[in-house]
Amino acid sequence: MQETRPLFDRVLLTNDDGIDAPGLDVLEQVATQLAREVWIVAPAEDQSGTSHSLSLHEPLRVHRKGDRRFAVRGTPGDCVAIAISHLMKDARPDIVLSGVNRGGNLGTETVFSGTVGAAMTSMLVGVPAIALSQAFTDRNAVPWDTALALAPDVIRRLVAAGWDSDACLNVNFPPRPAQDVRGLKVTNQGAGTLQGVEIVSGRDPRDIEYHWLKLARAPRDDDADSETVALGEGYVAVTPLKFERTHDQALARLRTSLG
């Protein structure tokens, strides 16, 4: 029988797709199954690709959208910071859930992800966090029902297992119906599919030049234990992430060469 008792007293939800994004609605439905009290503090507009960035040189504007629901003119990191340190300062959340992102956040791409950035900002200020993303094969037919069906049990299992305070969890749901998902795998980050950044240029109706940034993706060899491989095999991929980014091989080589 599926567990129905509240897991948390208070949970904070955020994302990088914006407060009106369908993935946030999915996450709210998930959170109401897990918590007695759900707070939503999310960007007023799409903030995809903003990573861990914080708005240090301009003020944040916070707009109340309902009971315990706020839109912030800022990044996902801003949302987490102002929620925990201001809006919820008298009763901090037990956990921050970030997502559900439209599309997977895998490998190198997690460095740029605002969804993951929000979770890592939460970790920085001492609140456990999970980033959740729903992979798709057709952007116009994202299988949100997969995350909706599986996320409550996945979160319960992760909380029961526990994880270190200097890590947040990155969860990716595969692009298939929930009944066809093969299970859950704990994975490493791996390389993912991000190859670089492309520039798409043009001219607007006023004949002013513009430039769009586009992430370039392509299949690449990856570690057998990576999240990208697990997702491709039909598993929910769970990867613990941390801030520490030292390249150990380069460190050893430079120390040998330079002392």
Curated annotation (Swiss-Prot):
Please provide the record's keywords in A-Z order. Answer: Cytoplasm, Hydrolase, Metal-binding, Nucleotide-binding
Can you quote a single GO CC term? cytoplasm
Name the major location: cytoplasm
Instruction: Tell me the enzyme class.
Output: hydrolase
Keyword Ribonucleoprotein in the entry? The reply is no
Instruction: Provide the protein's localization.
Output: Cytoplasm
Q: What is its EC number?
A: 3.1.3.5
Task: Give the GO molecular function terms.
Answer: 3'-nucleotidase activity; 5'-nucleotidase activity; exopolyphosphatase activity; metal ion binding; nucleotide binding
Give the protein's cofactors. Answer: a divalent metal cation
From the record, give the cysteines joined by S-S bonds: none
Residues binding a divalent metal cation, per UniProt: D16, D17, S48, N101
Name the chemical reaction catalysed here. a ribonucleoside 5'-phosphate + H2O = a ribonucleoside + phosphate
What Pfam families does the record point to?
SurE
Transmembrane domains' residue ranges: none
Q: How is the cofactor bound?
A: Binds 1 divalent metal cation per subunit.
Family, according to the entry, reads as follows: Belongs to the SurE nucleotidase family.
- Protein name as annotated: 5'-nucleotidase SurE 1
